[in-house]
Structure formats: structure tokens, C-alpha cells
């Protein structure tokens, strides 16, 4: 199997994540701190004296923060504001804050959920709560194959297993190995890994990158080895790191799956270090005590 361009895939995810972070700022949403503070205090607002700009701001706040007196739909009916204003900010906020009621209202009012290259479904695929919104977006035209199945890749990178299940229910033919390659190897979680393995993802993708980057994380290592991860991708340096983890459980499972830790005996030791160790041993210090001293794991010193 050809290698996936993991670097490019991860870069695309990182760029979108940065966009999401910016989206969550008041600078992007054009909500003033003063207005938000007042709204969160459940203050009474004279809505009959608001400029159009302030009407829009109030409607945004009604999505971001619930208010007993001002619902988005009621405000929309009163103000007659263009629901696609500010680059469809109402749609984006409804998705970001999992407001299913507002999203349905926007769709019924003619808002296109595919705007900005299907930004809405891309965003929702990374949000853990209320994944019914994904169904709502898809059933109203959202394209889950956009940008080389980006919603799948983003859901995987955000550890959103429930979103992945929904996405696969619509298109089960996506190569799960592509999703595995799109995650930063050092950030993958066991639940997502197990789910992708259940879809026959190749755990040795990109020369065993996932095992190499997670060689001390037991849940991931256990899943990888059980799924057939090739331990030959582990270098001597990896074995040294595993030993230095002082985790007997993880060493035991590696041994169970055929890892030969004796390979570290081939490490080239500098002459001055060898002389130092030999001197200590010649003076009667046992090698096992030296090992504990050098690893800072000798818990008790006895006189």
C-alpha cells in the first residue's frame, strides 16, 4: 500500500483547528464584551431601540447564551434581519453551540448549509455533543466527501467516535487507513484507534508511525499489537525509552508479542563511560544497583 501524506493531512487538520479557535473569539463573531457580559447577567434589554447592528449582535448572543426572555426565533421574527448576514454567522453559531432548534429554523428559512465549502459539517464533525446535528446537515445537503472526506478526518483527529459512526453510516466505503494517517500519531486515543481497527485500518501505516510515537502508552500499544503492529519498526532508541518508562506492564506486553529487548546490548558505549562503570563494579557495586542509581529509581538507600 502506498503511504499517505500524513504531514499534509495533519497540516490541513491543524489549519482548520486554528480557524475554529479564531471563530470562537468575539473578534470573529463581532460580539462586544460589554454586550455579552450584560446578556449573560440576564439583564432586561430595550429591544425596540436597537440599531440593526445591535439587533444582529443580540441574535448571536441568543444562540451562544440562552436567555429566558430573548430566543433567537422570537428575535428573528421581530427584527426581520437577513439570516445570512455576517457570512452566515447564525448558521455557524448554531452548529458550534449545538443549537438544533435554531439550525432547523435557519434551514426552514432557506439558509444553505453548504456555504463556505461545507464549513458547517466540517465544524460539527469535531464537536462531541449532540451529533444529531450532523444528520440534520447531511439530510439538508451537506457534503461529507468534501476535501477528501475532511469531516471524517477531522472527527478522527478530534477523537469524536460518535460523529465517525454517523458519518460511516452514510458512506461506509471510506478508507479507514486514510483516517488513521490523518491523526498526529502522538495524539491518537485508544477508543478512536480501536474503532478504526474494527474497520480494518492498517496499524502499520507510514512505517509503524503510530506504534513508534506511542511506544509507552499502554492502551494504544495493546490495541496496536493485538491488531498486528509490526514491532520491527521499533528501533533500539525506542526500546531504551520503553525500558526507561519503568512500566513493567508495558514491557511485559512487548515481550509477549516478540520484542527482543536484548538488542540494546548492541548499543555502542563510549570508552570513558565504560571505564567509569567498570571502576564502580570493580569496587564492588552490583550492576543491578548501578542500573537503579542511573535510572533514579532506587527508592531506599540503606547504610
From Swiss-Prot:
PROSITE patterns according to UniProt: ANK_REP_REGION, ANK_REPEAT
Keywords in alphabetical order: ANK repeat, Repeat
Species of provenance: Acanthamoeba polyphaga mimivirus (APMV)
DNA-binding as UniProt keyword: no
Descriptive protein name: Putative ankyrin repeat protein R601
Segments annotated as ANK repeats: 86-115, 117-146, 147-176, 200-233
InterPro entries associated with the record: Ankyrin_rpt (IPR002110), Ankyrin_rpt-contain_sf (IPR036770)
Ribonucleoprotein recorded as keyword: no
